[in-house]
Amino acid sequence: AVLDGDVRKCLPCGPRNRGRCFGPRICCGEELGCYLGTPETLRCQEESFLPTPCESGRKPCGGDGASCAAPGICCSSEGCVADPACEREALFA
């Protein structure tokens, strides 16, 4: 997908705001791993009310607009799956 200048980073979330929202109930960070449907994800529901789309993660994985969310984890706004393409070494290859 071609990135244009309009895409902003999704809201920060989780302990000390070290994660990013990946969906309304998903918060992930490189050091945190992923929270799904926990109190850490409550802030992510605010994304639904913001008018512009957002993007989290750097490396695409798994299709359907998903991207690497934490080492070994690939997330879309719908959920997360284990994905070896997202291992820490692969992120910086």
Curated annotation (Swiss-Prot):
SUPFAM superfamilies: Neurophysin II (SSF49606). It is found in: Secreted. It holds the Pfam family Hormone_5. Disulfide bonds join 10-54, 13-27, 21-44, 28-34, 61-74, 68-86, 75-80. One of its GO terms (cellular component) is secretory granule. Keywords: Disulfide bond, Secreted. It comes from the Eukaryota. GO terms for molecular function: neurohypophyseal hormone activity; V1A vasopressin receptor binding. Belongs to the vasopressin/oxytocin family. Neurophysin 1 specifically binds oxytocin. This is Neurophysin 1. It comes from Anser anser anser.
